[in-house]
Amino acid sequence: MSASPPSFLHSLKRLSLVTQIVIGLIAGIALALLAPEVAKSTTFIGKVFVSALKAVAPILVFVLVMASIANHKHGQETHIRPILVLYLLGTFAAAVVAVIASSLFPSALVLSTHDVAISAPGGITEVLQSLLLSVVDNPVSALMNANFIGILAWAIGMGVAIRHAGETTRTVLDDLSNGVTVIVRVVIRFAPLGIFGLVASTLATSGFNALLGYLHLLAVLIGCMLFVALVMNPLIVFWKIRRNPFPLVLTCLRESGITAFFTRSSAANIPVNLELSKRLGLHEDTYSVSIPLGATINMAGAAITITVLTLAAVHTLGIAVDLPTAVLLSVVAAICACGASGVAGGSLLLIPLACSLFGIPSEIAMQVVAVGFIIGVLQDSAETALNSSTDVLFTAAACMAQEDKAQAA
């Protein structure tokens, strides 16, 4: 009998993170149904998880962005410029789609705003002024106060400067980036417990209407991703190759998207995309560079996640959003998305940066991140499927357009 608990814990540990999150979600719902008073006491578990996310997010953004820029190879983009343009265009278009969808179908979240001062910006002018002041903030102050705009600015500046440093310095920075990533993975491993506490306490306190709110949010997210995959991306591909894009689009979704949906990792799907590119007869020197690069910067799904969840928080808090600010959010979301690769829940951890545009404090932004983890079982799978399938789709479109141009000449 004494061996049973360790055996059970060992079996639970061997399950995938997705399965553990589902178990945490179901357990939280069950506890809220069967023992609401006990469920309310699990608030502390959720608070610890959210606090851990708040702790790692600033240093994560700073180190990852700085290391990414510092280790970027000179001249790499010259071989794949048309594909790079498609990657950036597709990511920005996805953010715009998310802004429009969030305006048409606004989502409301259950957020705790007690003892938190919220100062909504008055318009694009005030947003830009605040943005500029955030950019020139002291780097130590930016890290301490989770000023993500300031963190991003200093990370970009330091990354550009360190590009001219010695190889040893850049290697150390890359190792530091890997170290931070390991810490983030440890925090993410506690997501099932954190989600259990958040779901149980939220449902016990706010009732099951909160869960219905998550379903609406998930529908908006998945709807945006389907629209981008089946409407926006085909339009971009048609603009590039000037013929029916759907055979290529459906092939990429079937051969790459389905695999990525279940692996939930763009990096893990790189071999699948390389093999598909080879079968499509694409130029090896092109796809061998563009596919790994796409897994890093082609993040349409991440742009949708960042935008929809940020605007859900904005709508919940009653903050008005004018058109110029919405456009600025699309740009920021696209830039943030490019830095979301390689980290579990990367797009969710960059939501506070987008929220800071609207004067939403880190305490509330991290509650939005926690909501993202609750719906992440489906959201992250759909996001990865869109991201990874689009890598090979845009690579194929650019190669086909180049071949057509060469034949015409």
From Swiss-Prot:
Signal sequence bounds: none
A GO CC annotation given for this chain: plasma membrane
Transmembrane segments: 15-35, 49-69, 82-102, 142-162, 193-213, 218-238, 301-321, 331-351, 357-377
Keyword Phosphoprotein attached: no
Reactions listed under catalytic activity: L-serine(in) + Na(+)(in) = L-serine(out) + Na(+)(out); L-threonine(in) + Na(+)(in) = L-threonine(out) + Na(+)(out)
Compartment annotation: Cell inner membrane
One of the Pfam families matching this protein, by short name: SDF
Chief location bin: membrane
Superkingdom of the source species: Bacteria
Recorded topology in the membrane: Multi-pass membrane protein
Keywords assigned: Amino-acid transport, Cell inner membrane, Cell membrane, Membrane, Symport, Transmembrane, Transmembrane helix, Transport
Molecular function terms, GO-annotated: neutral L-amino acid:sodium symporter activity
GO biological process, one term: threonine transport
InterPro entries named in the record: Na-dicarboxylate_symporter, Na:dicarbo_symporter_sf, Ser_Thr_transp_SstT
Keyword Transmembrane among UniProt keywords: yes
NCBIfam families: PRK13628.1 (NF010151)
Function: Involved in the import of serine and threonine into the cell, with the concomitant import of sodium (symport system).
Family (UniProt): Belongs to the dicarboxylate/amino acid:cation symporter (DAACS) (TC 2.A.23) family.
Protein name: Serine/threonine transporter SstT
Organism: Pseudomonas fluorescens (strain ATCC BAA-477 / NRRL B-23932 / Pf-5)
Phylogenetic lineage: Bacteria, Pseudomonadati, Pseudomonadota, Gammaproteobacteria, Pseudomonadales
